[in-house]
Swiss-Prot record:
Gene Ontology cellular component annotations, sorted alphabetically: plasma membrane
Location in the cell: Cell membrane
The protein, known as: Protein translocase subunit SecY
PANTHER family assigned: SECY/SEC61-ALPHA FAMILY MEMBER
Membrane topology: Multi-pass membrane protein
Matches recorded under Pfam families: SecY (PF00344)
NCBIfam families: 3a0501s007 (TIGR00967)
UniProt GO BP: intracellular protein transmembrane transport; protein targeting; protein transport by the Sec complex
Description of how the protein assembles with itself and partners: Component of the Sec protein translocase complex. Heterotrimer consisting of SecY, SecE and SecG subunits. The heterotrimers can form oligomers, although 1 heterotrimer is thought to be able to translocate proteins. Interacts with the ribosome. Interacts with SecDF, and other proteins may be involved. Interacts with SecA.
Length: 435
């Protein structure tokens, strides 16, 4: 199915150009992740590999954090800025509420505001991460620690983050898929060979012969579990709830009824990315505070709540996913606008009053779908973390549920976009021929 779709797509010049453009942008990003920031002692980075929050930071940075590259911040500042801007549109700041109702013009203003906020956050995160990692690496990370060096590193990191954000926007505008998701997707995929190598070394290298059988059984169970997660995730991400729609005025030959499809998980994978981004930065801050000698009870409690390696941290992570799923579901689908659009087009839901009645019906339905979606996302995300505690898996494997969610959801989104374009092209081609 996938390869046939790709084969059909490559036959069309415009589609082929979009796919190749997306691949090119991802390659540019991957090249940037290999360039360590000047002034950084690369050898000191090895002291940071065992930090519990590093895998989460690497996840949201597209795997650019491990070698402290110029793209180390990734799209994390932009993600946080997006959350802030979306919250400000919820009757918190009149100007942002007004922009949210201005259509395309308002969207451009909101995007510009998001970029400015992201730039400020990028500088703040750059300062925090550089100073924090220098402390955690026993003051060896910054090769020549002085104001000028710190300023240069922070400027490079903030600039790198804005470049990554721009690369993501180029994918969204001129390529296929959501740019932010594609950047993170590329980083996760690039880390898969190292993850497989790590599993192989842990279970098959220098292992006594009497333990090889149990290693094969365990890895076999792991593969089956991954395949089941892939199947379950694909099923839920593609599942739809169809709302029946009828029309008051029907043109001759046109159907009198149709349906409005809503995804069972309308928020997609964005809540997982939001939760990962929000969890990672504070976890790093409290790790630094602890390293500086502030071992107060509240610091330990905060560390426990934010570290996905602990039970409390795991459930905090799941809670954030649930919270952002409800939030982003209503960002994606506005019940008031949906009811208004249906009424304008002369459509209605059988048994539901147009206008306010339809809005209330949609709100109630979206809350139910968000409940299903949030439980699904939370379950898939924390399942491997639970398995880590039971089977002693590595932190990288423990984040496999989150990684699989992003990979599968991004892949499905790209395929749907590709299918939609090919279908539209066939339809337009048919209409042109008939004329």
């Amino acid at each position: 199915m996938f390869f046939k779709l790709l084969k059909d797509a490559f036959k069309i010049k415009q589609v082929r150009s979009k796919i190749l453009f997306t691949i090119f942008i991802i390659l540019v990003f991957r090249i940037g992740t290999t360039i360590t920031v000047p002034g950084i002692n690369a050898k000191a980075l090895s002291n940071l590999n065992d930090l519990p929050f590093l895998n989460m930071l690497s996840l949201v940075s597209g795997n650019a954090m491990r070698n402290f590259s110029v793209f180390a911040l990734g799209v994390s500042p932009y993600i946080t800025a997006s959350i802030v801007v979306q919250l400000l549109q919820m009757d918190l700041l009149p100007k942002f509420v007004e922009w949210g109702k201005q259509g395309e013009v308002g969207r451009r203003k909101l995007n510009q505001a998001t970029r400015y906020i992201a730039l400020v956050l990028a500088f703040v995160q750059a300062i925090g991460i550089t100073a924090g990692f220098d402390t955690l690496s026993r003051a060896n990370l910054v090769a020549n620690p002085n104001v000028q060096t710190y300023a240069l590193i922070c400027v490079l990191l903030a600039t790198g983050s804005m470049i990554v954000t721009w690369l993501g926007e180029q994918i969204t505008d001129k390529g296929y898929g959501n740019g932010v998701s594609m950047i993170i997707f590329a980083g996760i995929v690039s880390a898969i060979p190292d993850m497989i190598k790590g599993i192989y070394e842990d279970y098959f290298v220098n292992i006594p012969s009497e333990r090889l059988t149990s290693s094969f059984i365990f890895v076999g169970i792991l593969i089956v579990a991954v395949l089941l997660i892939i199947y379950f995730t694909t099923f839920v991400q593609q599942a739809e709830y169809k709302i029946p729609i009828q029309y008051t005025k029907v043109a001759k030959g046109a159907p009198s009824s149709s349906y409005l499809p809503l995804k069972v998980n309308p928020a997609g994978v964005i809540p997982v990315i939001f939760a990962s981004s929000i969890t990672a930065a504070p976890a790093a801050i409290f790790q630094v505070v602890s390293a500086l000698g502030y071992d107060a009870d509240w610091v330990k409690t905060a560390q426990s709540l934010l570290a996905t390696t602990t039970i409390s941290g795991m459930f905090m992570y799941a809670f954030l996913i649930v919270l952002f799923t409800f939030f982003y579901t209503f960002v994606q689908i506005n019940p008031e606008k949906t009811a208004e659009n249906l009424q304008k087009s002369g459509a209605y839901i059988p048994g539901v009053r147009p206008g306010k009645g339809t809005e209330d019906y949609m709100s109630k339905l979206l809350r139910r779908l968000a409940t299903v979606g949030s439980l699904f996302l939370g379950f898939i995300s924390i399942l491997p973390i639970l398995a880590k505690d039971v089977f002693g898996l590595t932190d990288a494997v423990a984040l496999g549920g989150t990684s699989l969610l992003i990979i599968i959801s991004t892949g499905i989104e790209g395929m749907k976009q590709l299918e939609g374009y090919l279908l539209k092209r066939k339809y337009v081609g048919f209409m042109d021929t008939s004329e």
